[in-house]
Swiss-Prot record:
It comes from Actinobacillus succinogenes (strain ATCC 55618 / DSM 22257 / CCUG 43843 / 130Z). Residues 1-85 form the YcgL domain. HAMAP family: UPF0745. The lineage of its organism: Bacteria, Pseudomonadati, Pseudomonadota, Gammaproteobacteria, Pasteurellales. Pfam families: YcgL (PF05166). It comes from the Bacteria. This is YcgL domain-containing protein Asuc_1390. InterPro entries: YcgL-like_sf, YcgL_dom. Gene3D superfamilies: YcgL domain (3.10.510.20). Coiled coil: none annotated.
Length: 89
């Protein structure tokens, strides 16, 4: 199964996986608004030998089949690092 991966301009580390490139009709309006304008990253074969770095290929496939999309949120650790960094000012 091929999927299209997009990154968010609004939130670093937020990625959207959908089955068909540029077909955002499956997304709820609230998600479209929160995600912002999607920036295409790549097409990815979820059943190929390569694995995704921050999420599981099978989980992405299951979510796409169930919901039409998979939303990868930023790591919590990245958020904590940002707070620690701002406190060092």
């Amino acid at each position: 199964m091929l999927c299209a991966i997009y990154k968010s301009k609004k939130k670093d580390g937020m990625y959207l996986y959908i089955e068909k490139r540029d077909d955002f009709s499956v997304l709820p309006d609230s998600l479209r608004e929160a995600f912002g304008i999607p920036v295409f990253v790549m097409l990815f074969n979820l059943v190929g030998k390569k694995t995704l770095i921050n999420t599981d290929n099978r989980e992405v496939m299951e979510q796409i089949k169930q919901n039409g999309f998979y939303l990868q949120m930023p790591k919590k650790d990245d958020w904590l690092f940002t707070i620690e960094k701002s406190c060092d000012l």
